[in-house]
């Protein structure tokens, strides 16, 4: 008999609130049950009866929202959930994914007791194998992060692997990671249990009911049109899995949801002669591209091949997902890998090769959050084959988002608004997911880049820079230079170099940083988001004063660095705004803020024809001229004095540069170094760049990339949104008090929260760490997410890091918390608490001593000095 995993999911008729939306199946003479009418209205309509939809409904009901209707076009748990391999793993690279998986594990563990529905939950533990030292380093990094959030795990030897799972061939292993509290479970039964609990709380569930389109009125969800009638609603949740892309387009105001399906294979065997114990650990052999779990005394094994098969590009998929065509030739490499890992499987009979579609996203992270174009339209899809692991936690965070207006954790890395509509091209998605699926098990070293779907958005200078040796990375679909390879460097060797240690581009970036310090460098920063806000009267100033925390009522020409805060005082954006005229403002934000910031501004801006918001990102090429000789270059090109006396810091002027007029020149560089940003109308971009490079030759000019920018800004303790700052970070927690108009009597979003925080104190503080006993040439490098220890106790994680070429040390930024030794509760973090601690940074299990600083290193260190001449212990913040 086929396993429950493949069997038809049993009906849910025992649950209150459950409705069959179609006649009961039976013989021709059977009595047909009359169709049940849908409610005319509800607060929330959830589309999708898989683990995501049922989890959202479950958590909404737990948070007090009872007026919820869940609609499923087929049968509950009959989509991807039905074919899920049932592996619950907490070992993830991203902190938010670790937290979602940990919550899911705890939820599923108690679900059977809560609902009475057997879910097959069995705590087996997981073993993650390493065939190479680099893979072991990757596991050690994950191990360090899991331990500090309370998930037990350890690095083990091949001998220990053999003890935990005697059937495994361990001769080629260098080590492994054991996570003892991981589990296996029947995903379909978990979905049914969640649905049952939601139904008992008042959620109404209807299967065999298809949503035709989502009705929108004035940019707000108004209801849904189904094949059985309309339901008026305030909120709609798209948990449609395979069908989410098409359903998004069926809205009266289309919603872009970038995901694409690929075929996913796994096999099932009959039991061993002596059946495997139910507690047999799950095995993940990423180097072999396979996973293995116990299944009814035999095994279930699948993987992520190098040459995946995209499916449903045309959008034609079934009402319910069926087992797709077997393809043993395609599965053969995974089967060979499986037999190498478990040679005794050769004698075991295979029951079936399962082929089911799985959805993948352009960046390997799931998609959740509210649509930027339709208020009240929420999305939870694109699990990249981790739906079971993420289902509980993701459903909880999305429900919090809907009920409270924000989730309890920072979920920006999963937010739908990290994508633009341009990333929803079917051709782009088809090509990208063919890369994404194998990447799930590929070794990902720091600073790796996607290779597909590139050159989607480029600066007008792209070809010019590419010809000069630019190496590129992608951000929000935009190509940005990382660094520039000198003619004498081996390009192929550099591109293929992947390491957790000192990278091959180290000396290249060092020379770019040196040029920024001593001469002049040019960085193309055209990808930055650029908005203009104008009005006929004072409307622009009034709304911006409310939306931003710093005072924007400044003289024309001044630039203000400011946060855009939420009601909790957290950063929704961190940006610079130049006042171009009394009624016009120019706003510069991080690249990935383009969709998010636009949606936030439109959410609060009144419908006033006299107030205009325009996205001008594409209108301007941005050149960042950094270094002490920028004054000479621009003076020669503009015939205008550029000294600080004539052009003070944080000032904006419209000037002529070369033959081009209308160049917005700003005295800032985003690095703390002297220089200017040039915002150039795109038709003049090539001319201005050529003129700058030509005149700059006598001053030692060269191109530079974002790696140099990163080193400069981290060394100067400049925090960036999306890396160091997020929606939970407040200005008071990162030294930004001076950029908040708390005492000016002007109301703004987040003001009350900041006033309260100022009175109560902060519970975490952004801190700069300078590594002391770290050998740059021999030791593993810090990148981000490394645990921070104070006096031997865990207090936080790094958010970003870079080698400081001036300090000749690694510099990390991260948040320090003060956990009570007795209760573990968070306490106020003071400057004294920071300064009196002895700190260590954990890099893949090895702790390195570090000096903590609350302020940038004094300016005397801006000149290159020998490491032994710099006594960091004698340095004090300003």
Curated annotation (Swiss-Prot):
Q: Where in the cell is it found?
A: Mitochondrion matrix
Cross-referenced Gene3D superfamilies: Aminomethyltransferase beta-barrel domains (3.30.70.1400), D-Amino Acid Oxidase, subunit A, domain 2 (3.30.9.10), FAD/NAD(P)-binding domain (3.50.50.60), Probable tRNA modification gtpase trme, domain 1 (3.30.1360.120)
Which SUPFAM superfamilies is this protein grouped with? Aminomethyltransferase beta-barrel domain (SSF101790), FAD-linked reductases, C-terminal domain (SSF54373), FAD/NAD(P)-binding domain (SSF51905), Folate-binding domain (SSF103025)
Keyword terms, alphabetized: Mitochondrion, Transit peptide
What protein family does this chain belong to?
Belongs to the GcvT family.
The record describes its quaternary structure and partners as:
Heterodimer of a catalytic (PDP1) and a regulatory (PDPR) subunit.
Q: State what protein this is by name.
A: Pyruvate dehydrogenase phosphatase regulatory subunit, mitochondrial
Q: Which organism is it from?
A: Bos taurus
What gene is this protein translated from?
PDPR
